[in-house]
């Protein structure tokens, strides 16, 4: 109920007071055209460490303390749907459109958070990318939640344990998908890479189910040491 009332108030406020760009402060959008263009054109995919050899390629596109990370935090915890559309456009133009035909698989959000926020933020981002691509990129929900664990604030050890129980493959959807597109490139997407435990375990499940081409894309990660920049397999 708390989140529902908050969403209504937020929608009314947005109607009365248009949002300001999170990059430059310009009135009228959560991210203005100029800032979207700047972020997209300067986006660099950097290699994710700790992917455990599960993926053909594992990259992140920005840091949590940058504009993309701020947009994600607001979208998730304040239920600002408009920001998800801006994130999707930047990620599509800055990286995903360079992959060619691909299948996006969103990491499923816990059912508790979906109820609270009245949305699954990663599924919404992937659906918008599918729309922007004109059908070149497809979104398929190969994964579902198995257990409603919440990892925010958990230690790395707890996260690893939770990750093994958090998601499962949708066997019916996967079987149909593999019959129709056995050689498709699957792109597993999540908003934040912290320890990477959830994405790695999800990747293992997809590989075990028969997915042969698997890429991991985290939109942001916590800032640690600098990682080498790559774009579609090339050292930048």
Where is each model-derived feature located?
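Glycine-rich phosphate/pyrophosphate-handling loop used in enzymes and phosphotransfer proteins
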Residues: 1-236
